[in-house]
C-alpha cells in the first residue's frame, strides 16, 4: 500500500533519527474513523470566489524533529504550529469531546505583518473532523499570524445569545533555509578551529618543555683511571 503524498513529504524533510524528537501528545491525533479532512480555501481579493471543496488525508504519527522542525503553541495551548525547514507549516489542534460535538466547521484565518500594516492571506474552512492542516510555501523572514476559530452548530433561540468560541492564534517566522545552512556550516568551522587551536597549544607546550629546556646529564663523580 502506497503512503499518502503528505506523509512522504514530511518524512523527506525530517532529519536523521538521532535528532531530538518532540513527540505528539495524546489528544492531538485525529479520530480513527476520520479518513478524510474536507476543507475549502477562500481566496482574498476582488476575484475571490466561493472556493472548491477539497479533501486531504489526516497526518498520523507526526514527530517534530529538531533542527528540521520548530514547534510553537498558542496561548491556550490547543493550537500548535510545526514550522518545517522546507518552508511549510503543519497546524495541529485539539478539542475536548464535549466541545468537539458542538463544532460545525473550523475557520482558519491567516495574515502576515508588513512594514506598517497587516495583510490577509487565504481563509480556509475545515470540516469538524479535521485536526490538522498543512500550510505550504510560506515566505522567509515574514511574521505570520494564524487564528483558528471553531464555529458551532445552530443553537436553540435561548442559547443563540451565547458568546462565540474565541479563536486560538499562533505567530511564527520561517527562517530562510540558506541561513540555516550557513549557521550549521559556521558551527562546524568554528568547532574545527577550536580543535586546531587546542592541538597547536599542546605542540607549543611540548616544544617548550622538551626542546627549549633539554635535560642535561649530571657529571659523574668517579675519577677516570
From Swiss-Prot:
The chain crosses the membrane at residues 182-202. Residues 203-225 are cytoplasmic. It is a single-pass type I membrane protein. InterPro entries: Fndc10 (IPR034446). It comes from the Eukaryota. Its main location: membrane. Residues 20-181 are extracellular. The keyword S-adenosyl-L-methionine does not apply. The keyword Transmembrane helix applies. Glycans are attached at residues 86, 109. Residues 1-19 form the signal peptide. Residues 72-167 form the Fibronectin type-III domain. Keywords: Glycoprotein, Membrane, Signal, Transmembrane, Transmembrane helix. It is found in: Membrane. GO terms for cellular component: membrane. This is Fibronectin type III domain-containing protein 10.
Amino acid at each position: 500500500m502506497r503512503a499518502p503524498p503528505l506523509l512522504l513529504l514530511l518524512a523527506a524533510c525530517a532529519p536523521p533519527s538521532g535528532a531530538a524528537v518532540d513527540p505528539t501528545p495524546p489528544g492531538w491525533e485525529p479520530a480513527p474513523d476520520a479518513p478524510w479532512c474536507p476543507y475549502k480555501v477562500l481566496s482574498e481579493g476582488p476575484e475571490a470566489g466561493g472556493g472548491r471543496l477539497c479533501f486531504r488525508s489526516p497526518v498520523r504519527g507526526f514527530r517534530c524533529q529538531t533542527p528540521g522542525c520548530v514547534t510553537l503553541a498558542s496561548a491556550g495551548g490547543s493550537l500548535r504550529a510545526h514550522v518545517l525547514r522546507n518552508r511549510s507549516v503543519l497546524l495541529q489542534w485539539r478539542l475536548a469531546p464535549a466541545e468537539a460535538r458542538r463544532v460545525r466547521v473550523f475557520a482558519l484565518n491567516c495574515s502576515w505583518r508588513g512594514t506598517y500594516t497587516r495583510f490577509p492571506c487565504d481563509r480556509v474552512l475545515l470540516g469538524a473532523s479535521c485536526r490538522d492542516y498543512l500550510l505550504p510555501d510560506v515566505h522567509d523572514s515574514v511574521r505570520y499570524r494564524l487564528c483558528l476559530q471553531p464555529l458551532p452548530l445552530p443553537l436553540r433561540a435561548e442559547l443563540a445569545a451565547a458568546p462565540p468560541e474565541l479563536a486560538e492564534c499562533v505567530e511564527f517566522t520561517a527562517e530562510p533555509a540558506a541561513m540555516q545552512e550557513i549557521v550549521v556550516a559556521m558551527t562546524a568551522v568554528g568547532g574545527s578551529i577550536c580543535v586546531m587551536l587546542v592541538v597547536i597549544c599542546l605542540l607549543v607546550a611540548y616544544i617548550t618543555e622538551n626542546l627549549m629546556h633539554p635535560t642535561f646529564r649530571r657529571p659523574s663523580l668517579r675519577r677516570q683511571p
